[in-house]
Amino acid sequence: MKNYEQKIANLRMRKLAQTQEKIEKEGLLDEDDYGRVVPPENLWNIIPNHPDGSFYGFDAWTDNFCSLMNIHPVYIDADDAFAGRWMYFMSKMRPNKWNPDYSYDFLKENIKKYDLICGIGDDAHFAPDYEIGVKLGWNGLIKKIEHYQSIHHSEEQQHFYSLHLRVIRSVQGWIQRHIDQAYRMAASATDDCSKNNLLEIAKVNERIIN
């Protein structure tokens, strides 16, 4: 029990330190704290596809996400039960969130008039069905996409499915790097509790990736 109490104390102290680092480097944020940690400086920047310096559309979102996942740092804490930490707020790195080529000026008067919280250009809170992912797993999602890709043959449909496959495989690559790191850390662990925890992290993520 004492071992677990110490692990909890260690995690709490690291969390407080990580939150303080975010405040010092990024300023105060009037929103959720999230589980994010500060990323290394100058490791990754967005890939614009528009003269305004931002990116829009399926292709650009896929290119940016996969580019980020391919270099996203691995994070494993031997005291923690989870692998990985979110470091980048990709959507907030865009200078603009709505493509100016598709004006919605005709809506702005009523948005202001009725004091609407406008979601145009936002990219989250679409209420995805997580049960699908839990039931199928990452490889199951790939098989489902490949199934529909095999029966819908238009160029647009084929491209749409190929982008989804790229995204899933980039996530799998990120998970695999954590698996590899967990095994490396377990091999050099000096106490059985940490070693077993790291091995369990690796094995659980091997199941998740498949």
Task: List PLM regions with ranges.
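Long, non-catalytic protein-protein interaction scaffolds
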Residues: 1-148
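Structured, charged N-terminal subsegments at the starts of enzyme catalytic cores
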Residues: 134, 138-210
